[in-house]
């Protein structure tokens, strides 16, 4: 009897060892509640695994035909080239997180090399820029990105007539806690791919952006339980934590030392656009800085406005020649005269009433509480008071977390609150006073003889987080094409929720000082609602005198550009 028990225990232990070391047959993993099919073994390589581009280019006759067609259609010596100025790979913190196996739509790592292959062979762009988040770079990843674009350019053929031109830059991902200290996200682009003509390290923002928080301390690590629940992919989960540790170990740069004199392996940041511009000037390399996603309420605080940014300290017309009007995160072009909240004559924030074009989220907060209250059988007058209180409580929140004043709310309860109804694919929770039209209409008359104003050329981009440059050419495969992501299923959502403090639905609202975004973790952002308003990305078009790097860059500097919603128009 003891011998049989011993054999059974040995077999069981052996089974567990095989299971937890990813050596058991696939059917054995089906007993685990978090199991999902992975026939392609998509997570074999991690974002830390070195990758190389495909060592080939498009046939010469394809490039010749493309050039001749565009020259003929334009009737000009210039041709229209299409590209993507905003591409993230899994070298970005949020993209790495979205690629984890327990996220729906995920299918493994998308390193910088994939961006070249996708842009060259799938979307067949003429140029692209890598722009991973500066806040989540390690020195190795910055150098990996540079080498990737150099590989892409080395296989492009004649530099005067390449099949594609690869550029590099980074995203300065600033997010303010309130409208007064919010400047927003900007892409910093460089002309050259020679490491000696590029900063030795990116310059990050100072703020509370997702990419910033995600990872520069050990607190950004994922729980070890993920690898136990999904042992087939434990190495991938572990690689995320290894990467977080590398970032946490990167020392902060000395702010008193000029940027070019700093060691390459330190973390440098700039709090404002003006500080960023000064640091870029210290390097002296040709660059363009492009604001983007300006109206996107996923991170933009209530009442955000271009006004506080339009001053001599934070404007550089030589750098900010372009602006991104459209991406997979939505349209930021159009101004509409509505507001998230408004201030009365006593200085109190109040909730505006709905219009035919716009349902304020604060108003819908009142409707949600009203419906819950009535459903419990309370008196109508009491429920009306609770509804009014809910609207008031919502607008007292100066950050993006107003929705948390409605405890336990679901995306469905909010309907289309926060979305303008007569704008083409508007960004989520639209902030109209950060729109491109509003910015162009403004002037600063501090110096009446030389007023300040913005003068932008328009570009579109994807803002893809899976290295799929120019993915808007076909509106298909939404989960893999767009950035719509989230936990894979209810089991994994339960795992995520187990470490967060989530409020239960109640028929009364919470005051601003009663919400706790930090404890809510990922649930402190309206990820599910945001996903409903994501789409495939846009494109940047340039009127260039040739296909080469100089011609493309010169067209961008001249503002001979336009943006599309993804198609070659």
Report residues per predicted region.
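Extended, charged catalytic domains and RNA/DNA-binding interfaces, predominantly
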Residues: 5-9, 15-569
């Amino acid at each position: 009897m003891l011998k049989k028990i011993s054999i059974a225990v040995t077999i069981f232990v052996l089974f567990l060892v095989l299971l937890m070391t990813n050596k058991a047959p696939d059917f054995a993993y089906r007993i685990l509640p978090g199991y999902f099919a992975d026939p392609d073994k998509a997570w074999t390589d991690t974002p830390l695994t070195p990758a190389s581009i495909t060592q080939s280019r498009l046939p010469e006759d394809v490039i010749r035909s493309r050039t001749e067609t565009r020259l003929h259609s334009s009737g000009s010596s210039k041709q229209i080239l299409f590209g993507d100025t905003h591409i993230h790979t899994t070298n970005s913190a949020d993209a790495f997180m979205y690629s984890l196996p327990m996220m729906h739509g995920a299918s493994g790592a998308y390193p910088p090399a994939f961006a070249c292959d996708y842009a060259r062979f799938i979307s067949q762009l003429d140029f692209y820029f890598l722009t991973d988040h500066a806040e989540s770079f390690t020195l190795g990843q910055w150098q990996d990105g540079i080498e990737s674009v150099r590989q892409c350019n080395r296989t492009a053929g004649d530099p005067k007539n390449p099949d594609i031109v690869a550029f590099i830059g980074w995203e300065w991902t600033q997010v303010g806690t309130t409208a007064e200290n919010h400047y927003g996200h900007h892409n910093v682009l460089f002309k050259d791919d020679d490491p000696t003509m590029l900063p030795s390290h990116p310059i990050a923002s100072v703020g509370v952006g997702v990419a910033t928080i995600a990872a520069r301390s050990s607190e950004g690590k994922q729980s070890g339980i993920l690898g136990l629940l999904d042992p087939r992919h434990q190495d991938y989960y572990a690689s995320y934590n290894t990467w977080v540790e590398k970032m946490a170990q990167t020392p902060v740069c000395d702010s008193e030392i000029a940027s070019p004199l700093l060691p390459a392996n330190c973390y440098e940041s700039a709090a404002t656009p003006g500080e960023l511009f000064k640091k870029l000037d210290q390097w002296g390399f040709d660059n363009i800085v492009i604001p983007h996603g300006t109206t996107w309420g996923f991170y933009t605080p209530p009442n955000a406005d271009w006004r506080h940014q339009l001053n001599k300290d934070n404007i550089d017309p030589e750098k900010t020649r372009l602006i991104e009007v459209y991406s997979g995160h939505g349209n930021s072009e159009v101004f509409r005269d509505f507001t998230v909240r408004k201030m009365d004559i006593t200085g109190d924030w109040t909730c505006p009433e709905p219009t035919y074009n716009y349902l304020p989220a604060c108003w819908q907060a009142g409707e949600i509480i009203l419906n819950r209250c009535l459903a419990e059988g309370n008196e109508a007058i009491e429920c009306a008071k609770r509804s009014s209180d809910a609207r008031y409580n919502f607008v007292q929140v100066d950050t993006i977390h107003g929705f948390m004043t409605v405890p336990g709310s679901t995306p469905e309860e909010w309907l289309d609150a926060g979305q303008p109804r007569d704008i083409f694919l508007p960004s989520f929770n639209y902030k109209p006073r950060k729109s491109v039209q509003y910015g162009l209409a403004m002037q600063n008359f501090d110096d009446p003889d030389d007023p300040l104003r913005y003068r932008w050329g328009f570009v579109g981009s994807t803002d893809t987080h899976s290295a799929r440059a120019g993915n808007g050419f076909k509106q298909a495969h939404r989960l893999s094409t767009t950035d719509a992501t989230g936990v894979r299923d209810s089991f994994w959502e339960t795992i995520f929720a187990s470490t967060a403090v989530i409020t239960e639905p109640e028929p009364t609202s919470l005051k601003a000082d009663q919400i706790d975004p930090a404890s809510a973790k990922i649930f402190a952002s309206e990820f599910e609602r945001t996903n409903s308003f994501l789409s495939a990305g846009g494109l940047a078009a340039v009127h260039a005198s040739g296909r080469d790097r100089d011609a493309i860059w010169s067209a961008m500097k001249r503002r001979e550009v336009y943006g599309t919603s993804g198609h070659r128009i």
